[in-house]
């Protein structure tokens, strides 16, 4: 008998194997291969998740560094790089496929959408605009306009998707926190991107009146509306198309703005007939429209699409970002910088020119106009430090030195949602209980460069009632001798350096009434009592202040209902008002 070879024995064993064994191995093979693929895909997905996490954390760190005072350009470069990496990783086909997995898919989608949104902000908007700002090739707005418009369109669906994800209960804590954080940023940024092209004249030229207030003659919203500049925005290009000063409007009288008898009683019969007094009422929209009416009656019929207020205090902060500017002075060029701008604009100019004379008025008007033009040129060209400019603008808005009004309802609604930029008092107490305390010079002087002010306010709750007590103190910090040496234009038009007439207006929180008053000083009293404005009880005081004198007025308001935390709105003064607030109700 011939024995089978090894190969023949192996073949025979294979032929005699049970079908169930072969099927088992086949099943194991079919199970093992997909399992291996899934494990590899999960490993790849885990790697991509780690990449996204690392990149987003790095981007966040760069932003925090910039907010803490770091270099903005470097931060933008870092955010751009990390956001691009995160968006690329989250856009991986494996990632997108995994988004259909129940529960986990929602979290992956949340991370992806957040990463893609940051990528659009950083790489389709932020970095290109920053590069334009740094390239020194002139005005950036016309070049940046299409970038902003395209970026806004790309960002809009991501903004909407993130807003919807905020309420998704499937998101785990870290993912939801990141989604909410990015969504909140986009909810503020998206309206800007949507509105900015139109504001810059992408859909037709827009005309904006720039109003310069003089804080040396304080009025509730800032100071005498001494100078105006008309700026035209046309497809991103900005140009000065007209300028005027307060003397332009001398003797103009009524300009057709409807003013109630109550307002004339509260602010005086000349309110609405003199442009410098247009900022008397602490409501920038009404003041802006009044200034526009003056312009249209005396200068030209240019349609005013909006008005922006700025004062020397804001200007000094802006000069920190742009660097010094040079303006022709009485005996050669004058350098204005962030340290000397307020002093020069609010005191030195009155030493150089006597504005009561025709020649002096022309000289000072030309100086202010040249200053406005130089600052406009520096800002519109993009020749400034981005971090310092962001601080200058935000600080000035917070202190009331920059305000804006737009005729377009959608644009105005956005401004009003932006807080103090609108220059209006809240209409209720749901978010804050805002008390208005405003100062007003009525001596036709520029003495308030030397005026020091303070406000002390408190909120208490007892027996179902809420009380707000506020005191305002004014100190005219100049000696009689020094006051007598001041230029005539700085002294009181009526009383020289003998005394200066001042008003203080307390605007009660909505729903509160006057409970009591108190006054300290040689000549101070309440006047024009029983008035309401802007839905609030108003408590006005008048005083006469010789050099070196101090006056304090105090009012307690009382009311029942719900009141938010106490806050103060006040006049931006040359010497910043010292404010103390205590609130034992919250």
Model-assigned labels for residue ranges:
Residues 41:
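Often metal-dependent polyanion-binding catalytic scaffolds in large enzymes
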